[in-house]
């Protein structure tokens, strides 16, 4: 009974966060892709938000929400949902943006030539065309959501620890008691819930989403029951009318250019002022002596993250090769990966750390980072492998390009853009996991290793120190992203592109 | 009277600091009742000319006039048949046609009536509920034609409409289109078609405009006044073919 209600609360949190992410991700992605002026600031912002370890910001978000709701449970619930949301949304927003950006040109021209306005275009063409991407990315997003759920249900504020009812809290309880049966049942429940969502929801939806792909051939897939149900039971006409009203309201607002632009300046000024005050507050002495430890800890964590990401790529390869050899297994691999990915490895972590002991905690930490990054490389590389034109694979078979030559000249270059996307997201995932991998609290005993995550946890009691650590980490990650990943990706996307 | 007029149209791109012109000062007049075919080598910017003429792409220099008025944006009296059909995969044949009628603000009942009428006209009756993916290339292009005709435009642009089809299907569809065009049943007053198939150009056109390779210029025009249906083996046809061929080759040599 206890587990049932715990599962109920966890599922509610995940799905609320997921629906908000879906809505936000679609709106953000479409808005960014449709207007170059917006694109210029929305995409770099998305890049930063996507790559920054959200868990690092969690203490800050919790403090704000708890303060706003005066410590009531709703504030904590919102903080938890917010954390899960931030783990799910960027993936969806990015997928949406990329899909709209790479939209078939002739379809866009067709829409223009038949006089479709942008409102009509978004509702009738973009949104349906997004369905395959959204469904595919939702699997990843939900799995990641479960990972963060565990971290979000137990909230530490300074010395106070607050627990929300849910499977994460239940698991921690069993771990503390050393109740193995309880732990197993909890994990079983999580796996079961995920298996059900994958099997009954996403599998049929993925099959159906083929209808929305440009250039697909063969008979049309059948409509799953859930789609028919949604179609018949929700008054889409009404929703669409409301949407139109909001949009036309926006249009009338835009006509008052003067008010709007002056309002914008007021907003800019306010933001600038706020930022200046923030900087002043941050830079004002005294400095905490622990700030000098930041670089050394950053490097320690970076090293572990690199190892974990490298391992993720290596471990993903066998699955990808299997998927290419027999494309009918892709759906199974996907379901398996989505289910496995949702098993929150975080909850086993204390057990593992305890059993390997203090000396090998570094190894255990890399293992945990791996569980936070492997799914990203796997999902992205699978997607990339599926997008290799079948003629290329047939050509390779026909000319007997096999073995090492095949991997070196065809498979790896062909998947390079998606491999890099996977690596970048895995890199983000591993950083995120670092926030929980470097310190384990067993009540009286604390196991801890050097790293930015443990430094961050020890700083939660002092807001200023916390901000310094979070900022240093953010800047470091953004720096590496812009000067390393981005360049590599742009190079690969240009060179290894199948379109002519 | 000129329905459509392109005056000194130039289109250029700036890439990596370099200036590339695709189209160089093209003049083109399309008279009412005329079927004009633009031919040119691949990559000569023929499709861009059509997109500029339809108001989808704005020229770098020059001006497009429709019925004597400068064209500010996509021409509401024009529609386009695309080389790769540009059908929406998740909509059925009928829904694909209804979609563009809806975009033009036509009420639901009339949408259905018009869609069915044009599905019938292109010979797709009983395929109303099929998805594009279930159709052959020729049938897909029939949907493309039905959709373009359904909005009852004054001018029809066709961007290599038969290039993605096999030879027999292309010949069939070409013939059917010419029948419709000469029957006077359509709302269309003029047609502009782009192709790289010179035989097709002579089969269909009243006038052929020959473009050079990039940056394209008009290198010549040929009036084709043979009676329809035209016989590709007739003497007159072959002499026009030779003339056209010579024109294209000379434009290559002069480069």
What kind of feature is each model-predicted range?
Chain B
Residues 91-98:
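Short coil-to-helix segment of the ABC ATPase nucleotide-binding domain corresponding to the Q-loop/switch region
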Residues 39-41:
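The feature captures the beta-strand-to-loop junction immediately N-terminal to the Walker
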Residues 98, 102, 109-127, 178-182:
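Conserved ABC ATPase "signature" region
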Residues 62-74:
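Conserved ABC transporter NBD signature motif
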Residues 131-135, 139:
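Conserved ABC ATPase signature
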Residues 54:
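Helix-to-loop junction immediately C-terminal to a conserved catalytic motif
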Residues 150-154:
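A short, proline-enriched helix->beta-strand linker immediately N-terminal to the Walker B motif
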